[in-house]
Amino acid sequence: MADFEEIINTRRSIREYDAKEVEDEKIEKILKAGMQAPGSRLGAEPWEFLIIKNKETLAKIGEIKPRVTNAPVAILLIANIERSFYKLVWQQEMSAAAENMLLEAVNLGLGGLWNGVAPEEERMNAIGEIVGLPKDENLKPFCIITLGYPAEGWENKFMDKFEESRIHYETY
């Protein structure tokens, strides 16, 4: 297990993966990390997860989100708005879950990429159709996290993004 500061400082978007399969135990840990994210009210978190390993399905989604095509596994995060306590904050709740998942991936020696789906309705509908999501206004595909062992040259590594000029105190 890596040091938390190291995880934060080395997480980056991994777009190329080794062909090695991601172990189910690691996928489960990543899902558990996502479910530990804060929501608008305990027990009212909107997230649901769809694990995709089938190469044909990944290729179909890849026609819309090209980075999904060659990933060993993808997880579609689906918001079930009906479950969210404050209906207007579902995207924040889903974002918290997604980042927890990406951080846990680094902790487990994996790389991940957040592929945005929402809020573009056409893209949300097309991806929902590919995976057989029921046509329900309360079910919203939010993002797709691709996971895998980083390909050579794509390892998680420190990239200094700190810019003091972006920090303000008391007033802008």
Regions found by a protein language model. Give the residues of each.
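Acidic, surface-exposed loops and disordered segments
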Residues: 1-172
